[in-house]
């Protein structure tokens, strides 16, 4: 025994036993693999953030808003929304933040919200276009008719009448700096101009990010519904049809009036019972906040205006005919920003395996997470720099993030097919609509070289 170790009171060093050696080796390897993967993830995110950081240092006038990205996030099937939000918050949002870009996030807690949101935005643009066209025609008509009109004296009582709409408009437009003139210390800013409205090529305006295959499916369907569908929702005729069926089943004769009265009384009693039930439930939940909407209201809000089976047979509405048949642009009349139809799309898959039998694959993916992070951050960097934008190819880009569907639970897919779920249905696309779209697509060799 070494005398020095003996003087210190230390015994002889011995190698650990076989079992302890196996234990510490497995533990060190497991923890080392996790630590290395997490370290590489931080390095990857930091590298791509540093690449786009110079863009945020560019000069921007105070009356201009930065480029705005629209983000649609959908949860993976049979799982929580937080799974998709982690991908957004950890890997996509930092790149957009350090690039100095603005973004708007639309989250979905049930199927149909993204489709309904996209379609409603397109319909709102169509309504504004129709209103602007009508106002222009009305103003031109007034200018022509004003030549034949003679000026007449105004009634003093009419001049003194109070117009609440005019008062609200005056209050909104009033600014003390216009009254004080040179005595104001803060100069008055001009109208805020969005950077997306100043680009020469509409493909370089804004951008759309779909996190999840389900979000991408609903986005495509929402574009078709908003452009080809009607402006007004389908009429709710459930109660009318029920009443009509009762009246049609009546027999002609002396009992017609009695039958009609009975049917009406039944409908009234049903309405009163439902109203009382709603009132009682409202009293019980009077002080609760964040209460979910009724199922009937949800289904009514998310009900499509146009079925996907009718996309190809639906004629193009006249207000969007120059957009779909010609090279005209669909822009917001107020901001002059190109619509979502012309903005390029980036699709990010959400890999998510659940179940006991998938544990080995989940463990492997857990230790290889850095490759997925590198791919997502590279796509986000390409979104910021706008380097690789290609025209939408129906046969190719309809399958974006298709690999995610292999992770969907088979039982969930089977149930979705039976219930006619939007995600399990085949994605329908019309050439008239998708021919105006663009997508972010990196070259294939770039991804391979990085992974190798």
From Swiss-Prot:
The keyword Magnesium does not apply. Residues 274-285 have a biased composition (Basic and acidic residues). The chain crosses the membrane at residues 20-36. Keywords: Membrane, Mitochondrion, Mitochondrion inner membrane, Protein transport, Translocation, Transmembrane, Transmembrane helix, Transport. It is a single-pass membrane protein. Residues 286-296 have a biased composition (Acidic residues). Residues 37-452 are mitochondrial intermembrane. It is found in: Mitochondrion inner membrane. One of its GO terms (molecular function) is protein transmembrane transporter activity. The keyword Cytoplasm does not apply. Residues 1-19 are mitochondrial matrix. Component of the TIM22 complex, whose core is composed of TIM22 and TIM54, associated with the 70 kDa heterohexamer composed of TIM9 and TIM10 (or TIM8 and TIM13). Belongs to the TIM54 family. This is Mitochondrial import inner membrane translocase subunit TIM54. It comes from Candida glabrata (strain ATCC 2001 / BCRC 20586 / JCM 3761 / NBRC 0622 / NRRL Y-65 / CBS 138).
């Amino acid at each position: 025994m070494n005398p020095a170790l003996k003087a210190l009171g230390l015994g002889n060093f011995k190698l650990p036993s076989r079992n302890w050696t196996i234990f510490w080796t497995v533990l060190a390897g497991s923890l080392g693999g996790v630590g290395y993967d997490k370290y590489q993830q931080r390095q990857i995110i930091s590298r791509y953030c540093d690449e786009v950081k110079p863009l945020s240092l560019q000069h921007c006038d105070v009356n201009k808003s930065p480029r705005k990205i629209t983000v649609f996030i959908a949860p993976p099937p049979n799982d929580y929304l937080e799974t998709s939000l982690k991908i957004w918050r950890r890997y996509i949002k930092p790149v957009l933040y350090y690039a100095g870009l603005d973004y708007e996030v639309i989250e979905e807690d049930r199927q149909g919200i993204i489709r309904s949101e996209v379609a409603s935005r397109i319909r709102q643009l169509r309504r504004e276009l129709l209103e602007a066209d009508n106002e222009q025609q009305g103003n031109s008509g007034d200018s022509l008719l004003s030549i034949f009109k003679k000026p007449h004296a105004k009634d003093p009582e009419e001049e003194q009448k109070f117009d609440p709409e005019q008062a609200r408009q005056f209050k909104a437009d009033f600014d003390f700096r216009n009254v004080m003139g040179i005595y104001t210390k803060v100069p008055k800013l001009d109208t805020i101009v969005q950077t997306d409205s100043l680009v020469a090529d509409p493909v370089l305006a804004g951008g759309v990010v779909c996190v999840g295959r389900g979000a991408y499916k609903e986005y495509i369907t929402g574009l078709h519904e908003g452009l080809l569908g009607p402006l007004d929702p389908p009429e709710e005729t459930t109660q009318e049809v029920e009443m009509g069926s009762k009246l049609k089943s009546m027999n002609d004769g002396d009992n017609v009036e009695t039958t009609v009265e009975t049917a009406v009384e039944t409908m009234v009693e049903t309405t009163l019972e439902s109203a009382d039930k709603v009132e009682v439930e409202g009293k019980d939940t009077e002080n609760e906040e964040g209460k979910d909407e009724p199922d009937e209201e949800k289904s009514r809000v998310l009900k499509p205006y146009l079925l996907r089976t009718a996309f190809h047979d639906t004629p193009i509405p006249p207000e969007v005919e120059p957009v779909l048949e010609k090279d005209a642009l669909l822009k917001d009349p107020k901001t002059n920003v190109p619509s979502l139809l012309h903005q390029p799309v980036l699709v990010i898959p959400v890999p998510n395996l659940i179940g006991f039998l998938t544990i080995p694959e989940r463990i492997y993916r857990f230790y290889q997470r850095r490759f997925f992070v590198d791919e997502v951050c590279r796509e986000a960097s390409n979104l910021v720099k706008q380097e690789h934008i290609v025209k939408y190819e129906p046969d190719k880009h309809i399958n974006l993030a298709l690999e995610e569907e292999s992770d969907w639970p088979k039982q969930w897919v089977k149930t979705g097919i039976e219930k006619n779920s939007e995600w399990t249905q085949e994605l329908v696309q019309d050439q008239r609509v998708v021919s105006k779209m663009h997508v972010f697509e990196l070259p294939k060799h770039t991804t391979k070289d990085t992974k190798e």
